Amino acid sequence: LSRLPILINDHPMTSMDRVRSSARLLKSKNRCDMVIVDYLQLCDMRSDQKNRNREQEVAQASRKAKLLAKELDIPVLLLSQLNRASDGSIDHRPTLSNLRESGAIEQDADMVMLLCRPALYGKTVDKKSTYPTDGLGIVIIAKHRNGKTGEVYFHHNQSMTKLVDYIPPLEWLTRNAK
């Protein structure tokens, strides 16, 4: 990993304008194939327009990210917070409506992926897949402008902070074989 050409800008309160400027400079030197923003709501969103609310500011930042992707012809991955509404649902699976502070994120994005770990909510079996939840993680592809939506399961090894393909335990496979 240390040999990969990854550049990290950890300047506090970086704005999308600063991200764009850095990405354009790096792209001009053929050193920018992707931009990742971790996370959108931490970006500096101060603007000259005084009467903007937080939702409008997040919408503008989301739009700037979309324009950056088009301008430089690279993927821009925006990480975003979710609101806590999914905590109240039966299976705790997040949905597009849980994107925090802006429907514009959903509108601008070509793809929206949401993460879920049922064991964090005390579940022992995932209601939808019926898989045991110990180490189970779910990537919910909630929007895909050019493809299918659905779910992808992975195993999360917390002690190593490692993600691998999910393979149900042998007992589950034996019990559910038909």
Kindly give the residue locations of the regions a language model identified:
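Catalytic P-loop NTPase motifs of RecA-like helicase/translocase cores
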Residues: 43-44, 85
